[in-house]
Amino acid sequence: MPGIAVKIIDPDTGAELGENEQGLLYCKGASVMIGYLDDPEATSKAITPDGYYNTNDIATVDRNGCIRIVGRMTRFSKIAGEMVPHEMIERRIEELGHLDNLVAVAARPDERKGEQLVVFYAREAKFDKAELLKKMRDSGLPNLWIPRADCFFEVEAIPMLGNGKKDLKKVQAMAKELSEDVF
């Protein structure tokens, strides 16, 4: 992108990553914001001292400078040191179980691995959990990306926003409530 400098940063260490390595996308340039009006705290969280804006997108940059957005940082979990994408797991569950917009993936704390995937599914969703998990394993997903059988939770309905998208804040709040019940 002409006039825009980008870099990919490891979300844990803050180190700049190399070509095709997945991390947080930072950018700066004349058309990139320099801060939040009258909110220095928010500005310091979003803008680095050298002027790069944290997009909160997980991305890679190839040797030609092409940026590939993988997802939003808020839609990833860190499980046993690996970044695990909620949205990709959600799509795979929806595809394999024929459950369009009837599932939502979030995470809750896990003492051993950092976080644990949880799957909420709408009461109207009809599927065989054991069969779905087998299909997920057979589809080539890494084991860390496959939720445990005891981490599927039925809800009346998946919370939705007025625009028809999943209400991810409510989904994450539901996962937080689960963790409060467990820990």
Please report, for each region that a protein language model flagged, where it lies by residue:
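Conserved C-terminal "lid"/linker of ANL adenylate-forming enzymes
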Residues: 77, 106, 118-120, 135-183
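Short, flexible hinge/linker loops that cap or flank conserved catalytic cores
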Residues: 18-19, 46, 111-113, 146
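Generic structural signal for well-ordered beta-strand positions
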Residues: 16-18, 62, 68, 161, ...
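Conserved AMP-binding/adenylate-forming
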Residues: 1-59, 63-64, 74-76
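AMP-binding/adenylate-forming catalytic core of the ANL superfamily
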Residues: 29, 34-35, 56-145
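Short glycine/proline-enriched turns and hinge-like loops at secondary-structure junctions
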Residues: 17-21, 114-116, 165
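Structural motif
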Residues: 51, 97-100, 156
